[in-house]
């Protein structure tokens, strides 16, 4: 029978010298000095302790044990002669009387060294995730995730929100991404869907008489991976409030999030309430994005007028946006790499020139501007030494390309980017409608359940593209954490809103029957939001990949290489749910 441990591997101190102890953990490494002397590192969840083997017999025993086996060590604590003050246990060591193997590692070689697992190939890390997670630097992110989620729960409870779980098996609904479908065995030809979000359920809860709801909600979307988006599933701090306005939602978020970011984040400064509010159109005009990184103090300048008829082909008949960077001393190589990265991200080119210390326009496209130097300097407010980045295209394309250029220039200029803080902002006043890029027809811009500003009157009397919605995004350091809205709780306004995109009352009833019917029985005005838990933790940890903060993430191809999912299933399993596979033809 295994003797219970008396201490963990991060617990023993100099005051424990002379005590007899039992430690358990993973055999991490050994430094062999001679045939009867070796220094073994024992690691558990909490830390490491040095074990000093001083007998030939015990050295022979450990020679037959592979690294990463789990062992039990019983022995006596003593003071170390060569102390390591960087370790919590660095003043002591344990001299073993007995070593027992608890779980053998049967492999002589590991897929990667545990303490260097972050440098290994990502698919290897994910396949052997149980080894990767033994790396303290990897494990610490998952531990932090647990603490952050607990803190968020506590804060929501303190504010009077009820944690209510909503169904995982539900119906398919048009919410922007592809559904994961689950065949219903007892209902041939019918399917459940995993929820893309608890959107309808939380709104129905408000119509059911609940006042404040939240949950750490799992969401499932069949969409491609990105650095800040995990394919398949993710979690969000989902919340909804009855009889609430946009400002009520803002107040809750501004009370809940900054303390969590400051307490656990790699940066110890976060925006204080109230966060900056930026209308969508203003954000696009000033920053070239609806996800501005406000740590960067650069803004876009309209250069369309001063660049007109300059003879530079890409500018002819286009909107031109400029970004002026003072004190930008980057080399030509850096400038070229920034322009190349803009093209990779946007498929559009970026251009540039400088005003040198002598007041001359040099570099880049400067030869096209010599005849209007004074006008360019005046229009852009240039001073000697200023660098100017430019983009051109249709207005929205020029803005978006400039937004990418702004971010890259900011990151390359220490003077213009404060990197040691969390800068939150609200993007507000989104358009209710837009013209779809593919359809060419009127579509909802964001959330079809948003309340239009001006209500039914605006829908009946205003040009659709001019109507704004009570819709908002929460952004931190250039990352969109969440979208939210004041909901359209009035069936009449809802029908009218959908009519403008070509859907009638019967379509609404067919697509959203439960929510529509619930609202017909008297629903309160309500509003909500759902910050992404994974993205928040990614920012708090200072990680660039969201997969680093998820215990068992899929890879970029939406595959779980550890478990082997997705996988084929037995023919009988398909028969049980009345499904036949129709494979696409090979090209």
Question: Predicted segment positions?
Answer:
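Class II aminoacyl-tRNA synthetase catalytic cores and aaRS-like
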Residues: 1-587
């Amino acid at each position: 029978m295994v003797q219970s441990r008396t201490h963990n591997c991060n617990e023993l101190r100099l005051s424990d010298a002379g005590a007899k102890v039992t430690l358990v953990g993973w055999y991490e490494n050994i430094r062999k000095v001679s045939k009867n002397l070796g220094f073994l590192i024992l690691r558990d969840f909490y830390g490491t302790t040095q074990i000093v083997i001083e007998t030939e017999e015990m050295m022979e025993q450990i020679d037959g044990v592979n690294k990463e086996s789990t062992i039990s060590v019983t022995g006596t604590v003593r003071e170390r002669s060569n102390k390591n003050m960087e370790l919590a246990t660095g003043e002591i060591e344990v001299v073993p009387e007995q070593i027992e193997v608890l779980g053998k590692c049967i492999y002589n070689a590991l897929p990667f060294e545990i303490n260097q697992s972050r440098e290994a190939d990502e698919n290897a890390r994910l396949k052997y995730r149980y080894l990767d997670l033994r790396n303290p630097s990897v494990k610490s992110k998952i531990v932090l995730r647990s603490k952050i989620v607990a803190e968020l729960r506590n804060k929501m409870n303190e504010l009077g929100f009820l944690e209510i779980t909503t169904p995982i098996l539900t119906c398919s609904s048009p919410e922007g991404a592809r559904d994961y479908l689950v065949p219903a065995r007892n209902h041939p030809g019918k399917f459940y869907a995993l929820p893309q979000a608890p959107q309808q359920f939380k709104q129905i809860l408000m119509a059911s008489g609940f006042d404040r709801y939240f949950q750490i909600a799992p969401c499932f979307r069949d969409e491609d991976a990105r650095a800040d988006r995990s394919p398949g599933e993710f979690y969000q701090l989902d919340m909804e409030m009855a009889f609430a306005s946009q400002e009520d939602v803002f107040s809750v978020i501004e009370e809940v999030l900054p303390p969590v970011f400051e307490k656990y984040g790699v940066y110890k400064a976060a925006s204080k309430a109230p966060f900056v509010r930026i209308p969508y159109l203003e954000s696009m005009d000033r920053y070239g994005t609806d996800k501005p990184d406000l740590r960067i103090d650069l803004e876009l300048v309209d250069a369309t007028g001063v660049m007109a008829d300059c003879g530079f082909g890409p500018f002819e008949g286009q909107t031109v946006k400029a970004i002026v960077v003072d004190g930008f001393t980057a080399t030509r190589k850096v400038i070229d790499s920034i322009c190349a990265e803009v093209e990779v991200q946007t498929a559009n080119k970026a251009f540039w020139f400088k005003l040198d210390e002598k007041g001359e326009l040099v570099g880049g496209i400067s030869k096209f501007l010599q005849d209007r130097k004074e006008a360019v300097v005046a229009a852009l407010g240039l001073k000697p030494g200023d660098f100017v980045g430019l983009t051109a295209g249709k207005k929205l394309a020029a803005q978006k390309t400039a937004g990418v250029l702004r971010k890259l220039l900011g990151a390359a200029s220490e003077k213009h980017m404060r990197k040691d803080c969390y800068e939150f902002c609200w993007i507000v006043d989104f358009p209710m409608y837009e013209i779809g890029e593919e359809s060419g027809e009127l579509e909802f811009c964001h959330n079809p359940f948003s309340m239009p500003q001006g209500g039914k009157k605006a829908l009946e009397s205003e040009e659709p593209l001019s109507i704004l919605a009570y819709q908002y995004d929460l952004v931190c350091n250039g990352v969109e954490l969440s979208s939210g809205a004041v909901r359209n709780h009035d069936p009449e306004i809802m029908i009218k809103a959908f009519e403008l995109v070509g859907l009638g009352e019967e379509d609404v009833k067919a697509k959203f029957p439960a929510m529509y019917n619930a609202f017909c029985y008297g629903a309160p005005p309500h509003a909500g939001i759902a910050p992404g838990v994974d993205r928040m933790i990614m920012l708090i940890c200072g990680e660039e990949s969201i997969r680093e903060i998820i215990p068992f993430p899929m890879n970029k191809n939406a595959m779980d290489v550890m478990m082997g999912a997705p996988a084929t299933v037995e023919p009988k399993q398909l028969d049980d749910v009345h499904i036949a596979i129709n494979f696409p033809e090979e090209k």
